[in-house]
Amino acid sequence: MSRIESTFSSLKTQGRKALIPYVTAGFPFADVTPELMHGMVAGGADVIELGMPFSDPSADGPVIQKAGEKALSFGIGLVQVLEMVRIFRTKDHTTPVVLMGYANPVERYDIKHGAGASESAFIRDAAAAGVDGMLIVDYPPEECVEFSARLKAHGMDLIFLLAPTSTDARMAQVAQVASGYVYYVSLKGVTGAGTLDVDAVEAMLPRIRRHVNVPVGVGFGIRDAATAKAIGKVADAVVIGSKIIQLIENQPRDRVAAVAHDFLKEIRSALD
């Protein structure tokens, strides 16, 4: 059982829902991320999604795009992201970390760091750093059988996005390769957009669960405790990203972790 599976299993036994915050690695300061991750765990995070900065993030809204641009300006690449996870793991051996990003940097890392025909350098190094899963936004499920198998061989899960526009055929494809959990994008468009229709989410989840036998997390548009509580009643996990980025972006360095901690504590309290 992977660390992600174990976390969801434990939460289910307790009758609780997973709280999954997203932050961009290296934002708002290049060296604050491990400390920020610890602060989020102390605030009630069960799994952390760590964004890998990329210059052309097509699925990200303006808030997360801007965070990625700032991280890139600090020189944050995949080598630095893995080092952040490694530092986090020196004190936290239990909280799952999922890397979220795009195929291009991963493929460039493999070329640069000597991937073989049957091995991915990035998967190998991510496993060594203590990563638990990956969500590669632009990897279609039908092309991920080998990638998923390589991740599983290193004890990691492959997370996929589903959307209101996902067909039953697409859900069936995702079900064949997904593990850990799936992330239901509750709005059409990019991250941080629009307002969330809880009734529409509730109507969609049974359809997803007919195909997918892993937990379902819901994100995009969750900005406060009331919305998180409503989503927590129907989903297995609540994912929050853009709101956290907005809260921390203008904080002094010594307040970043505390601000994220306090916000997540409020969300955790509403979920429980």
Curated annotation (Swiss-Prot):
Pathway in which this enzyme or protein is active: Amino-acid biosynthesis; L-tryptophan biosynthesis; L-tryptophan from chorismate: step 5/5
EC nos: 4.2.1.20
GO MF annotation terms: tryptophan synthase activity
Xref: Gene3D superfamilies: Aldolase class I
Keywords linked to the UniProt accession: Amino-acid biosynthesis, Aromatic amino acid biosynthesis, Lyase, Tryptophan biosynthesis
Superkingdom of this protein's organism: Bacteria
Catalytic activity: (1S,2R)-1-C-(indol-3-yl)glycerol 3-phosphate + L-serine = D-glyceraldehyde 3-phosphate + L-tryptophan + H2O
Keyword Lyase set for record: yes
Any matching Pfam family: Trp_syntA
GO cellular component entries: cytosol
Disulphides: none
Active site per the UniProt annotation: 49, 60
Matches recorded under NCBIfam families: trpA
Family, similarity comment: Belongs to the TrpA family.
Protein role: The alpha subunit is responsible for the aldol cleavage of indoleglycerol phosphate to indole and glyceraldehyde 3-phosphate.
Subunit details: Tetramer of two alpha and two beta chains.
Protein name: Tryptophan synthase alpha chain
